[in-house]
Amino acid sequence: MIQKKTFIHPTSIVEKGAIVHEGAHIGPFCYIGSQVEIGSGTELKSHIVINGITKIGKNNVIYQFCSIGEVNQDLKYKGEFTRVEIGDSNLIRESVSIHRGTEQGEGVTCVGNHNLLMFNTHVAHDCLIGHHCILANSTTLGGHVEIHDHAVIGGLSAVHQFCKVGSYAMLAGCSAVVKHIPPFILAQGNHASLVGPNTVGLKRHFSEAKYKAILRAYQLLYKQGKSLEDAKLELAKLAELHPVVILLLNFLNQIDLNSDKNRGIVR
């Protein structure tokens, strides 16, 4: 179904069954599969393949040579009906690949709203990217990776399967992540290790009072020699006075130390 006021270049192929909403713009030499939905105001520049069960929201801009919704690279995948969901107002630059999910995950690879995925970023099956994230050039996400809101991933970095990068965290360029990066943290290296709090990002997003509370939480987690469980007890007390700390506490509570997929946190 192609609605009115929609532009589709005559060299592009839109399969029967695809839904292209009003105001969408599909440039030359694109392929849109039969189970794809493209929201209003979304622009596809040129030479883009969108396939599988893929839903793309409103006002996204997708640049040339991107591949979205194709079969993932998990060898266990046998053609199950899994999907990709992309929200609104994302900027997806050249040669980005976003693969469909697997039944072993949640069945969906998800990108939220207002994200920037720079050139040659790879988003593997079952990844979850929140809102307002930046993934710089040639970022590589393994399967089941989570990138939480306002996180920044430096260029040429890779994140191991099942790792989580917390909100407002930053990973420096050319890093390799094999453990979870908690919220508010700056990490760097191969393997990525703790540098300190993400001071530049925190000052940009938070008031002075909240910034100081986050620094206090950082001290409790990293600088007082506490076990993770003891640190969580102290963080819970701090969160009663400063709700911004709940973001860190919830992240740590999501980590199942007894799971065979637990990666631990960067130190």
Curated annotation (Swiss-Prot):
InterPro entries: Acetyltransf_C, Acetyltransf_C_sf, Lipid_A_LpxA, Trimer_LpxA-like_sf. It is found in: Cytoplasm. SUPFAM superfamilies: Trimeric LpxA-like enzymes. Keywords: Acyltransferase, Cytoplasm, Lipid A biosynthesis, Lipid biosynthesis, Lipid metabolism, Repeat, Transferase. Pfam families: Acetyltransf_11. Pathway: Glycolipid biosynthesis; lipid IV(A) biosynthesis; lipid IV(A) from (3R)-3-hydroxytetradecanoyl-[acyl-carrier-protein] and UDP-N-acetyl-alpha-D-glucosamine: step 1/6. Its EC number is 2.3.1.129. It catalyses: a (3R)-hydroxyacyl-[ACP] + UDP-N-acetyl-alpha-D-glucosamine = a UDP-3-O-[(3R)-3-hydroxyacyl]-N-acetyl-alpha-D-glucosamine + holo-[ACP]. One of its GO terms (biological process) is lipid A biosynthetic process. It comes from the Bacteria. GO terms for cellular component: cytoplasm; membrane. One of its GO terms (molecular function) is acyl-[acyl-carrier-protein]-UDP-N-acetylglucosamine O-acyltransferase activity. Signal peptide: none annotated. Belongs to the transferase hexapeptide repeat family. LpxA subfamily. Involved in the biosynthesis of lipid A, a phosphorylated glycolipid that anchors the lipopolysaccharide to the outer membrane of the cell. Homotrimer. This is Acyl-[acyl-carrier-protein]--UDP-N-acetylglucosamine O-acyltransferase.
